């Protein structure tokens, strides 16, 4: 294994650049919150910008989380030559666990878990073992938590 340093910064994640855009997006989205009223719903304003977004409908509260794989894939890709495994099955399970954690914080439980695979390039999926491990792990995690 080489001496690569895995960090958010080395993976291209610069919170100094990202955070102002996130704040601007939250402000712009807040201006659209009244649109929920067209559907008989209203946002729970305190949830905006938190781990899970919550809105109220006539019969229930609903919550939404979008979570990507993050930078765990960097570690998995470095470990694959050492272990011979992709580790993407466990990365998928960890990602679903983070979604559940974000939902539980607002008192919600998952019913549907959206698979958000932002791989940057379709060529990433050409590694069938890695892609299949990712899908298999995601499905196993959804089954374990009773969600689809």
Residue positions per predicted region:
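N-terminal amphipathic/basic leader segments beginning at the initiator methionine
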Residues: 2-42
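Glycine-rich phosphate/pyrophosphate-binding loop regions near the starts of catalytic domains
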Residues: 34-148
């Amino acid at each position: 294994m080489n001496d690569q340093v895995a960090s958010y910064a080395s993976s291209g994640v610069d919170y100094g650049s990202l955070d102002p855009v996130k704040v601007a997006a939250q402000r712009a989205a807040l201006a659209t919150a009244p649109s929920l009223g067209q559907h008989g719903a209203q946002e729970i304003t305190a949830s905006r910008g938190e781990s899970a977004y919550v809105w109220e409908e006539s019969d229930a509260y609903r919550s939404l989380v979008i979570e990507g794989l993050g930078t765990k894939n960097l570690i998995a890709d470095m470990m694959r030559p050492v272990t011979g495994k992709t580790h993407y099955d466990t990365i998928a399970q960890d990602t679903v666990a983070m979604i559940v954690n974000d939902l539980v914080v607002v008192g919600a439980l998952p019913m549907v878990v959206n698979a958000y695979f932002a791989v940057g390039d379709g060529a990433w999926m050409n590694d069938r073992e890695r892609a299949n491990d990712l899908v298999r792990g995601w499905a196993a995690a959804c089954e374990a938590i009773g969600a689809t």
